[in-house]
Amino acid sequence: MIVATMSLSACDKSSSEPVYSSVGVEAFNYTSYNLDHFVVRDQYGNKASGGGDLMPGSGAGSVSCCYALKGTDFTVDWDVYDADAAQKQIDAQQDISVIRKTARVHMPPAEVKGKPGQNVLALHFYPDDHVEFEFRDDLQGARISYAKVDEWFQRTYGKAANPDNLDDAKSFRRTVRVAADGWKKYGLTSEKDLEQYVYYALIVNPRFDEYPAVQKILVETKGKPDAFGDAMRKLSPATVDEIKRFRPEQKEVVRG
């Protein structure tokens, strides 16, 4: 579902299509890749672009201005790359492998209330490669904070959070990959939910979500922000120990 926070725009006198003038664009990158560049195209030949090597979880405040767009149907093309793979390629004096992605976005007519240059079309890039549009009159609006999740994880678990002594950037990207997986598999977005997902996946058991009691929690808390995190924190030490020792082939035994 595409999110539009407002309801009606100015319309072209020669058609009923909405027209957005003097619009800035910013991207919020929730993928596990660095977002190098993006282009938004409407069906009338207009385009807007931005990017600038946005690391996972970043984008707020990075605005490109000013553009005109028209209509309700758009195509978004963007380039991403894996920062860990890129570093190896740089060390080997090779070109960085860039991945091109494309998505189509439908946005109902949206009212733009700010003055020219104050309106921002926020593009939310999700881990499953779908994109959502949202008009804003500020430079905020991030829906997933990987940085806060990783800061909590590193502060709370110390050496256990980074047992192989990766540098901060690599350790952060590892956290991001797991958190992004939590979104793709279960739609988790809140800090509480992602904190617990990362902890259990990286420290307790990478397949913890296949444990019957955890699967029950995932079903019962679906669509309820923070509920998964709260439920996982309440598990007894004995249950956590069982999850740590759990193997998927034992599932039927555990149920019995």
Describe each model-derived feature in a short phrase.
Residues 1-5:
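Sec-dependent N-terminal signal peptides
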Residues 23-33:
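Structural motif
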Residues 32-42:
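Short, ordered, surface-exposed loop/turn motifs in non-cytosolic proteins
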Residues 40-85:
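Tryptophan-paired
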Residues 6-10:
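C-terminal motif of bacterial Sec signal peptides marking the signal peptidase cleavage site
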Residues 19, 32, 68-70, 97-99, ...:
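Solvent-exposed loop and beta-edge segments used for protein-protein assembly and interaction
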Residues 12-14:
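Bacterial signal peptide processing site
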Residues 84-256:
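Beta-strand-rich cores of mature extracytoplasmic or soluble domains
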